[in-house]
Amino acid sequence: MTSNSKHNQGVIQRLRRRLSSLIPRVERNAVFEVLRRDTLNLPPRSPDLRIDQVTADNLQDISQFRNETVLQTFRQYLARKDIGVYAYCDGLAAGHAWAALWHGSKRLVWGYLPVDASTACIYFCSVSPSYRGRKTYQNMLVELSKLVFESTPVRRILISCALDNLPSYSAIERVGFRRLLILPILRWRGHMIRFARIPKVESDNQKVPRS
């Protein structure tokens, strides 16, 4: 490829990014919940899979498959006392998941999931491509949810995924989360419009119907 061709290709890519930023983008996200009184379904776990809580002592382990930027982000999560777990496969950190907790001020995860004194939200979950298909994600969701319910007074945990992300959608339902609603979102030039709101946590004698 000539230098002119490379230059032209770069110009085209920049124009595409610019045009893309000007076009409103519509997302459809499935929002799920699990309540303190619900039963979580722990999936089978292979002998080489271990789930540990993230602490100052093992925080650095995530460098085995994530970069320095992610490590620094996790330092911030730990400093603000969010709860995280690492999945270890064959002795190596190969997955992570975090739960956002309320610390006295209003907080939204992803701009639409509310965190308050009664509700936590699971976010920033990932599994190394080399270790997918081993129910790693499902095991992390269950262990993290148990940690949150055991160590905080929250009554509900929320999690969301794109409606077309079938592997995540299926994994979330299999461990015991139920779908609360489908949330359409319009994003445009840094702004976000939600077309529905997350219901407040139900009382112990009230049922929320599936959407």
Write out the residue ranges for each language-model feature.
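Conserved acyl-donor/pantetheine-binding loop and adjacent beta-alpha core of acyl/acetyltransferases
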Residues: 80-81, 88-120, 124
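Acidic, metal-coordinating catalytic segment for phosphate/diphosphate chemistry
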Residues: 200, 207
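Extracellular-facing segments of soluble proteins and assemblies that are Gly/Ser/Thr-biased and enriched
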Residues: 64-92
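Acyl-donor-binding surface of acyltransferase catalytic domains
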Residues: 1-74
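Conserved GNAT acetyl-CoA-binding A-motif
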Residues: 148-161
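Conserved acetyl-CoA-binding loop-helix of GNAT-fold acetyltransferases
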Residues: 124-129, 133-148, 170-174
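Conserved catalytic-core motifs of GNAT/GCN5-like acyltransferases
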Residues: 32-33, 178-192
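Conserved active-site alpha-helix within GNAT-family acetyltransferase domains
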Residues: 163-181
